[in-house]
Amino acid sequence: MNNPTSDDRLRFQQKCHKSMLNTGAIFKNCKLRNGDVLQEVTESLTEDSEFNYIVNESQNVSTRLIFWNKWIYILCANTSSNITATRIFRLDDDQPWNLESLVAEVCPVDTDNRLAEHAARTAKDTSANELNYESYQEKSRAPFGFAGPFGAMPGSQPMFPSIGASDLYPAGIGGSDMGNDGGMIPTFNHPIFHPENRSRNEQASANRTNIPPGARYDPTGPGDFRGFGRDERKPQFPFKGPRSQFPGEPDNDDFMPPGSSDMFM
């Protein structure tokens, strides 16, 4: 039998259908080539019909026959787990088809167990993620275990210098206990509003022509004394006076970055 007729093709389809039922598969429906769906096998079957079954009460399995030369290919697919397999029979083989191995290949015994374990594992992970989130919240703490912001504690001397704390507040408002003579909102007590109190070097120094009064200045290299408020022509000891500053030391008007009082922000 090299070229099966239409009747032969329908006969082989019915043979395949009976073989599937012998494996314990439950017939679900049959889809014809034109898209019609049959709830039972009748004589109106056409070539290339797709038979759908239920295996192990939960797995959806589809079969389809392909005829080529002297062979019949049975294509089987588990649409629930995307497992496929194929069996080949000769057209002149009149023996019954045993498709138990085919069904077992596309529907392994542990398929349901794997699906159940996956569902249980997913549910477990979901429940673990839904635990009280607040129980895992770690309260924000200041550095080194201090309850207050980094710097001076109220009523005590700071263990670490509160660098830039005075820049966060206007003069006389807030700040540390060490005093506050400046801030990001200068008042009329700020030196920029009292040029008469500036030093002679600050007013006349040729090296400060491009530096506005009260601005921060970082030295550009050796011999640059503008950060000390003096120039090379009038050397003086840089640490003279209580308000002497190192080169590059932040001025009272320098802004502190947001969240500077809490390193965890």
Swiss-Prot record:
Stretches the record annotates as Disordered: 194-265
Stored InterPro entries: PI31-like, PI31_Prot_C
Pfam families in the record: PI31_Prot_C
Compartments where found: Cytoplasm; Nucleus
Domain of life: Eukaryota
Function: May play a role in the establishment of transcriptional silencing boundaries, preventing the propagation of heterochromatic silencing.
Family from the record: Belongs to the proteasome inhibitor PI31 family.
PANTHER family xref list: PROTEASOME INHIBITOR, PROTEASOME INHIBITOR PI31 SUBUNIT
Subunit structure: Interacts with the 20S proteasome.
Protein's UniProt name: Silencing boundary-establishment protein FUB1-like protein
Source species of the chain: Schizosaccharomyces pombe (strain 972 / ATCC 24843)
Organism lineage: Eukaryota, Fungi, Dikarya, Ascomycota, Taphrinomycotina
